[in-house]
Structures are given as C-alpha cells and as structure tokens.
C-alpha cells in the first residue's frame, strides 16, 4: 500500500537549470575528512552540469572559506548569475552586537556579490539546494579515503590536494561543460577580484589625515 506524504513533507524533485553558471549551490560540511580533527569543507557546485566549481578546507565554516571558493570560481569560470545557499551559513544576515562592519559576515559577502552583479538566495530547507547536499554525501564516501592514501594531515596539504582532485571528480561524475550554454560572464581581472574579495573595515580619518588600524596609524 502506497504511503501518503503530507503537503508539508512533500518536496518535488527540482529540474536542472539549463545553463552552466545559471545557478551555483554553496555550503560547508564539518566532518572528519582527514587526520584526527574535524574540519569544514566549503563547496560550490553548478546545478546544470553537476560540475564542482570550488572546494576549500578551513578549521570551521568561515567567510574566508567562501571567499576562497568564490575566488576559484571567478578566476576559472567567471561571474555566475545566482548563488543558492543555506540561511545558517555566513550568508545569513546576523548583525553582531559590536556593530563592527568587519564582523558582519553577510554584509561582507553580499557586498562583494553586489559589486560583481551576483544574485544570492537563501533558505533553511535542505531541498532548496539538493545538488550540494548530494555532493557532500558523495564526498564523505570518497574523499577521506583518498586523503588518507595521499597521507594528508594538514589543511594546507588538503587544499593543495583539492586543486587536482576537483578535475578528477568532475571527469568521472559530472556532465561535460557546453560552452555554448554558459551564462558565466567574463572573468574579472586578478586586481579587481582581490579588491572585491576583501574584508571591509570602517575607520575615521582624524585631524592629522590618518587612520588607526590594529593599534597603528597610517
């Protein structure tokens, strides 16, 4: 006998996007990927092709982790149209009590995306970004063993390993990229990328035309 699913629990399968770069899904997964300490793997995957477009390890889920995978995307593919992610990540707006703009992570990332013309959508529902959820399931089955065989023990070693692992993963499991169906805009210059993927600090110019940062005047 077929079991009826309630409307609240029903999540119809989402069709793939038509174009490469039309929608990227981002998230981070804390797991025992290598060694004896859990780390956060930040990931971005293209919805249309299943191509992994960015991977980066950090000690925890951080703005730095998302900036690094965004840097990989911009330098290799260009500017995507839309990024989908979870509300529980640094993409969610949570104003810190200190009111310091540099600690307001959503402001930092959203401003960077606004400068590039990238749209952001967030949701707390896992089915909102099924592609990246399934990616982490696959990576949890495959990646720890490969890192162990490569004798990886540090984050730096793991990130270096990922630079070659992404291509092997995509060649085996993703659809081929059809450049005629790409909506990625042209790659910005390295100088522009470095200026945009930065952490902003609000400072006041004093009467001596100087600013103070980390106890130093400039």
Sequence positions of predicted segments:
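RNase H-like two-metal-ion nuclease catalytic core shared by retroviral integrases
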Residues: 85-87, 98-142, 155-158
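Short, charged, surface-exposed loops that flank catalytic or proteolytic processing sites
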Residues: 27, 146-162
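Active-site beta-loop-alpha junctions of metal-dependent nucleic acid enzymes
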Residues: 55-82
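Basic, flexible linker segments flanking DNA-binding modules
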Residues: 1-26, 31-32, 95, 100, ...
């Amino acid at each position: 006998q077929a079991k009826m699913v309630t409307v609240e629990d029903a999540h119809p399968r989402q069709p793939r996007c038509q174009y490469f770069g039309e929608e990227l899904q981002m998230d981070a997964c804390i797991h025992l990927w290598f060694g004896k300490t859990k780390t956060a793997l930040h990931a971005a995957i293209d919805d249309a092709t299943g191509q992994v477009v960015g991977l980066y390890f950090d000690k925890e889920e951080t703005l730095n982790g998302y900036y690094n995978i965004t840097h990989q995307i911009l330098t290799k593919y260009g500017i995507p149209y839309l990024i989908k992610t979870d509300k529980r990540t640094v993409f969610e707006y949570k104003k810190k009590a200190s009111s310091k703009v540099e600690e307001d992570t959503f402001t930092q990332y959203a401003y960077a995306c606004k400068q590039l013309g990238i749209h952001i959508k967030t949701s707390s529902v896992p089915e909102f970004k099924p592609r990246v959820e399934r990616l982490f399931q696959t990576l949890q089955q495959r990646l720890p063993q490969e890192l162990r065989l490569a004798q990886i023990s540090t984050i730096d070693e793991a990130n270096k390993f990922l630079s070659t692992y992404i291509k092997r993963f995509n060649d085996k499991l993703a659809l081929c990229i059809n450049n005629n169906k790409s909506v990625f805009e042209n790659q910005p210059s390295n100088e522009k990328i470095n200026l945009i993927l930065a952490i902003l600090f609000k400072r006041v110019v004093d009467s001596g035309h100087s600013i103070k940062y980390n106890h130093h005047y400039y």
